[in-house]
Each structure stands twice: as structure tokens, then as C-alpha cells.
């Protein structure tokens, strides 16, 4: 993973091109990402940059984390994130990055935690087809049906698609276009939708695929 930015999903809107074409965009607010630690191969076994963003009241920060932030001379943020880089020595503790890291037209990958939908059945969770609505069928309209065979193998195979918890997992959307960068307000406008609910943390990195 290359160096990226941590932002917060604000919601969706649309903007118009000069030709009058409507483009759906997701607005991501990017507050300054401040470097709290630089990890190197010699000391930590790998090269990485640890950053924080946002604000957290000092009364909500425990002593170990307060010491960690104080060592970096950085105000406590709402969390810590890490980006692996090729040359960590190029970065300094206390430096910061903002939305100007990206430019309009650039392709980016976006990671977030999808909306949790609780315990769901096979029809909604795995797009199973429903059974007959009539013709003698009762109580089994949305049942997923058989889950295995007989005495052999005598068990249900792992990863069998069944009802269960849906959502609330890490999701990556690749190669989204940066439509606009509002450096003054710290906003990134990304084409299309991104995972997660409004207010959720989003990680934006340069696209892996061209």
C-alpha cells in the first residue's frame, strides 16, 4: 500500500459538467493527516507511516496514547492508521498531508466498512432464488433448502452459503475517479458511491490498477 489519506464520508450529491452532464459524487472530508510515527526496517522490520486525523478530547485519551501523541508533538486524533511506504526516511514526525495530495482526474482506491445489516436470510445475503409462492408450498418460500448430502460426508461443508450476518466488513472499491479537489474546505469529490455510512472513516489511496 502506498501513502494515502484518511477522511470521513459526508454523503452524496451531484455536480454538472460544462456540457450539463450530471455526475454523482461522494463527498469525503479530509482533515490534515498528521504523522505520529515513522517505522523503518532497521527498527520495526518494515517501512511505514502512522498517521492520525480529527480531534479527540484529552479526557478520552488514556495515558499510553497520550504519551504517544506527546512524543510526536501532535494533538490527539480520533484514531491511528498506517500506510506502508518504500522510503520511510523521507517523512518527518509531526508533518501533515491534506486533500491536495490528489488531483482531479486521478484514479484512487477507497476502503471503508460497509453498513451492517444484521442477521439476514439467504435471499438477501446471497441473492438466492425464492421457492414457489403456491403449488402446495407453505412456510418455505424463502428457505434456502438443502445444505448437504447424506451419511457421506455427513456434515455441512465450510463456507456453505447460508443465512447469517450481512455487512459490517472491510470493503475496497477500486479505480474511482477524483472529480474535484476542494483544498480550501478539505474535500474530495469521488465519482460514484463508496462503502460505509455517513460519518464513517474512509481510506483513500492511489489506484493499484491503472
Curated annotation (Swiss-Prot):
Keyword Transferase: no
GO molecular function, one term: rRNA binding
Signal peptide interval: none
Positions of transmembrane segments: none
InterPro entries attached to this UniProt entry: Ribosomal_uL3, Ribosomal_uL3_bac/org-type, Ribosomal_uL3_CS, Transl_B-barrel_sf
Post-translational modification comment from the UniProt entry: Methylated by PrmB.
GO cellular-component term (any): cytosolic large ribosomal subunit
Subunit description: Part of the 50S ribosomal subunit. Forms a cluster with proteins L14 and L19.
HAMAP family, sorted: Ribosomal_uL3_B (MF_01325_B)
Protein's recorded name: Large ribosomal subunit protein uL3
Native organism: Francisella tularensis subsp. holarctica (strain LVS)
Amino acid at each position: 500500500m502506498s501513502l494515502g489519506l484518511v477522511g470521513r464520508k459526508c454523503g452524496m450529491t451531484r455536480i454538472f459538467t460544462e456540457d450539463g452532464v450530471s455526475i454523482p459524487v461522494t463527498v469525503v472530508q479530509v482533515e490534515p493527516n498528521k504523522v505520529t510515527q515513522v517505522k523503518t526496517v532497521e527498527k520495526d522490520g518494515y517501512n511505514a507511516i502512522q498517521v492520525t486525523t480529527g480531534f479527540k478530547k484529552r479526557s478520552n485519551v488514556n495515558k499510553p496514547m497520550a504519551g504517544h501523541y506527546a512524543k510526536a508533538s501532535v494533538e490527539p486524533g480520533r484514531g491511528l492508521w498506517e500506510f506502508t511506504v518504500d522510503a520511510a526516511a523521507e517523512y518527518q514526525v509531526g508533518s501533515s498531508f491534506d486533500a491536495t495530495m490528489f488531483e482531479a482526474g486521478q484514479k484512487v482506491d477507497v476502503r471503508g466498512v460497509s453498513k451492517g445489516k444484521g442477521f439476514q436470510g439467504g435471499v438477501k445475503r446471497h441473492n438466492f432464488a425464492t421457492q414457489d409462492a403456491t403449488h402446495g408450498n407453505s412456510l418455505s418460500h424463502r428457505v434456502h433448502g438443502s445444505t448437504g448430502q447424506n451419511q457421506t460426508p455427513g456434515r455441512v461443508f465450510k463456507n456453505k452459503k447460508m443465512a447469517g450476518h450481512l455487512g459490517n466488513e472491510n470493503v475496497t472499491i477500486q479505480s474511482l475517479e477524483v472529480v474535484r479537489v476542494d483544498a480550501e474546505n478539505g474535500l474530495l469529490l469521488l465519482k460514484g458511491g463508496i462503502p460505509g455510512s455517513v460519518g464513517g472513516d474512509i481510506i483513500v489511496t492511489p489506484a493499484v490498477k491503472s
